[in-house]
UniProtKB/Swiss-Prot annotation:
Part of the 50S ribosomal subunit. Forms a cluster with proteins L14 and L19. Disulfide bonds: none annotated. GO terms for biological process: translation. Belongs to the universal ribosomal protein uL3 family. It comes from the Bacteria. Keywords: Methylation, Ribonucleoprotein, Ribosomal protein, RNA-binding, rRNA-binding. One of the primary rRNA binding proteins, it binds directly near the 3'-end of the 23S rRNA, where it nucleates assembly of the 50S subunit. The modification N5-methylglutamine is found at residue 157. This is Large ribosomal subunit protein uL3. InterPro entries: Ribosomal_uL3, Ribosomal_uL3_bac/org-type, Ribosomal_uL3_CS, Transl_B-barrel_sf. One of its GO terms (cellular component) is cytosolic large ribosomal subunit. One of its GO terms (molecular function) is structural constituent of ribosome.
């Protein structure tokens, strides 16, 4: 089956709130700052081997922009943003975009189902109980050392090693994660806001990518 590509949008998580329906029900929503994305490059099959739209958003001090990036932004005649993001699109869609143009929040509509991708909150080094939902050992009844110990890591001299992927203590969080099939509750282009039903990954102030749902 051929995968269909569609344009997404880069925003910033503002926090959570709630909205009320006409019949008085409360809906929890995440508010996403949706300032216009500036198009920095159009990639085509002829020049790059695939079709894509590259965008930037926000602002970055000139001192923090290296020379290759500065040249890239200057060529597109757009202000340097806080990063570059790329969205694969269908070949037929490229005619709708131009370098230096903008992509706004109105590419989404109320009721649409979307996927939101972000970087989860970092939790630092954590044990197996918090990181992998292991069960604790007994608090008493002869247990004096292994209340939160993970237990056995393997077998004996055969195979004589710990298998890759074994669930152990380690760094938790700060990974890229997607939450799928969230409903768009409100789109406010003038104020630059998108409200989606439910929670999205990451802390307030973190960049998030909103895309049409891949499995809806």
């Amino acid at each position: 089956m051929t995968k269909k590509y569609s344009l997404g949008f880069v925003g910033r998580k503002a926090g959570m709130s709630r909205v009320f329906t006409e019949d008085g029900r409360s809906i929890p929503v995440t508010l996403i700052e949706a300032t216009p994305n500036r198009i920095a490059q159009i990639k085509t099959v002829e020049t790059d081997g695939y079709s894509a739209v590259q965008v930037t958003v926000g602002a970055r001090r000139a001192a923090l922009v290296n020379k290759p990036e500065a040249g890239h932004f200057a060529k597109a005649k757009v202000e340097a943003g806080r990063g570059l993001w790329e969205f694969r699109v269908e070949d037929a869609q490229l005619g709708d975009f131009a370098v230096g143009g903008e992509v706004k929040a109105d590419i989404f509509e109320v009721g649409q189902i979307v996927d939101v991708q972000g970087v989860t909150k970092g939790k630092g080094f954590q044990g197996t109980i918090k990181r992998h939902n292991f069960r604790m050992g007994d608090a008493t009844h002869g247990n004096s050392l292994s209340h939160r110990a993970p237990g056995s890591l393997g077998q004996r001299q055969t195979p004589g090693r710990v298998f890759p992927g074994k669930k152990m203590s380690g760094h938790m969080g700060a990974v890229q994660q997607s939450t799928q099939n969230l409903e768009v509750v409100k789109v406010d282009v003038e104020r630059g806001l998108i409200a989606v039903r439910g929670a999205v990954p990451g802390a307030a102030g973190g960049d998030v990518i909103v895309r049409p749902a891949s499995k809806a």
